[in-house]
Amino acid sequence: MIERTIETATKRYPLLLGDGAARVLPSLLRSLSCPPGTKLFIVTDDTVAPLYLDEVRALLAAAEYDVYAYVIPSGEAAKSFDHYYACQTAALQCGLDRRSVIIALGGGVVGDLAGFVAATYMRGIRYIQMPTTLLAHDSAVGGKVAINHPLGKNMIGAFHQPEAVVYDTSFLRTLPERELRSGFAEVIKHALIRDRRFYDWLRAEIKTLADLRGEKLAYCIEKGIDIKASVVREDEKETGVRAHLNFGHTLGHALESELGYGALTHGEAVAVGMLFAVFVSERFYGRSFAEHRLADWFAGYGFPVSLPTTVQTPRLLEKMKGDKKAYAGTVRMVLLCEIGDVEVVELEDDNLLTWLDEFARQGGKG
């Protein structure tokens, strides 16, 4: 099992990664001063619950913890105020107190919602991230928790670091191909923004999604977490370089919001967003990334590589202006200087709209 210590300006906590990592939960809880009898509140979704909830609950009950569970619908639409409020209500009805621990058993949606519940329940209680998807290798580390608003994604949230991340990779065996693809988008993102050697390894070793198995999958997760952790160590509250992790997310979040959450997976939207960011980078910096054939590379995994024909670019621009990186209505995007190096740049509306229209016509191959 791989062990890491995640360090931020306000907290240090362990990350445990490997097949069977869930088995360490009882000893981990004891190390966190959670004696038997402590109330534990597992938040999961209706996809994960039939697969792993009973297993995790039995493990904790055998260690004499007082275990409760709350199941939300799967999918991005669950990151709503209604589901957040219902989860808070369930926690109150179960009698959770300030010594209780919430366990987020699921993907990014579960982690975001459960983490935000933990951040705000009784002004903040402890929680543990237990990712069950590849996508959550990114969201489980760093303490950003949130719910969505109809006007934008992750607009209501907090920075609330977990007590630990327990990443049992055996849970990934039941992951559908589309969800595996979605998570791989964030792996690609980490390579593009921070690590040219990892990018080259991905191009050479992960030819298809079928290659995301065994040691190669574990290496992708380990590298992605290490890159995310290094950024969070430098900038916990996203006042500087942590914004680089939003590469592809300015347009990606706009697409998710405009199309309705669930029409595209998060990774599919981010993939289109990354290709658009490269498209803009070429025009902003006057250089070409054509030799990398990024759109062809993405398409080889089954990612969409162009805007859906149903979207209107002026509406996308308005959504992008609501992005959390924007200042005074000015869009700020993470652009690619070269493979492994990015920066945040302010862009004028007229230029962005022109580039959105051009990208809509040409796709990522422009």
UniProtKB/Swiss-Prot annotation:
Keywords: Amino-acid biosynthesis, Aromatic amino acid biosynthesis, Cobalt, Cytoplasm, Lyase, Metal-binding, NAD, Nucleotide-binding, Zinc
Protein residues bound to NAD(+): 74-79, 108-112, 132-133, 144, 153, 171-174
Organism domain of life: Bacteria
Cofactor note: Binds 1 divalent metal cation per subunit. Can use either Co(2+) or Zn(2+).
Catalysed reaction, written as an equation: 7-phospho-2-dehydro-3-deoxy-D-arabino-heptonate = 3-dehydroquinate + phosphate
Binding of Zn(2+), residues: 186, 249, 266
Tagged with keyword Metal-binding: yes
Keyword NAD: yes
Compartment annotation: Cytoplasm
Gene Ontology biological process: amino acid biosynthetic process; aromatic amino acid family biosynthetic process; chorismate biosynthetic process
EC number from the UniProt entry: 4.2.3.4
Cellular-component GO terms for this entry: cytoplasm
Gene Ontology MF terms: 3-dehydroquinate synthase activity; metal ion binding; nucleotide binding
Pathways per UniProt: Metabolic intermediate biosynthesis; chorismate biosynthesis; chorismate from D-erythrose 4-phosphate and phosphoenolpyruvate: step 2/7
Needed co-factor(s): Co(2+); Zn(2+); NAD(+)
Disulfide pattern: none
Entry-linked InterPro entries: Dehydroquinate_synthase (IPR050071), DHQ_synth_AroB (IPR016037), DHQ_synth_fam (IPR030963), DHQS/DOIS_N (IPR030960), DHQS_C (IPR056179)
UniProt similarity note: Belongs to the sugar phosphate cyclases superfamily. Dehydroquinate synthase family.
Record's function text: Catalyzes the conversion of 3-deoxy-D-arabino-heptulosonate 7-phosphate (DAHP) to dehydroquinate (DHQ).
The protein's name: 3-dehydroquinate synthase
Lineage, top ranks: Bacteria, Bacillati, Bacillota, Bacilli, Bacillales
Gene label: aroB
